[in-house]
Amino acid sequence: MHKLVDTCDYPGFAMLVYRRGEVVYEEVTGMMDVATDQPLQKDTLVRMYSQTKPLACAALLMLFEEGKFLLDDPVSRYIPAFGKVKVFAGMNLGGMRLVDPERPMTIRHLFTHTAGLSYGFDPQHPVDRLYGQAKLIDLVSYGQMPLAEMMEQLAQLPLVNHP
């Protein structure tokens, strides 16, 4: 953390590890406000983004510890629609060329962001355009679509690469 702050890649970090009811590690380094040279404090309020990922992973790993699933279980065991997913393999005269995945998408792939799912950020990529047009995350976030339905529709979209 110190190296990232020292090289000015990030203004500051706060980290706390809590295990079995006790704080086992806590560190704060860097600036809360670089312009005013105000240091980051333990009680500084900050904006946090994309925090559902670590929370979901922590909850899932608790279930993993209980033996409820294995990391190499296929996603299709829990969401059958992912058993029919296709992978983008380029464009041809008829449009997108789709192929079967080289291996099944697993829980491990989801944890490591190697499942082949797109974020929809690149408007030049045909698969990203489809993800962006589907607006699935927005529909779920604003309560306009149940999560189960979103998963069914997500499985209809091609993967940007093989898991």
Predicted feature descriptions by range:
Residues 1-20:
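Beta-lactamase-like hydrolase cores
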Residues 13, 31, 117:
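Gly/Ser/Thr-rich helix-start
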Residues 19, 25, 65:
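A cytosolic small-molecule/anion-sensing beta-strand core signal
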Residues 20, 32-34:
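Generic structural motif
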Residues 27-29:
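Short hydrophobic alpha-helix segments
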Residues 34-163:
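Active-site-proximal loop and beta-strand segments within enzyme catalytic domains
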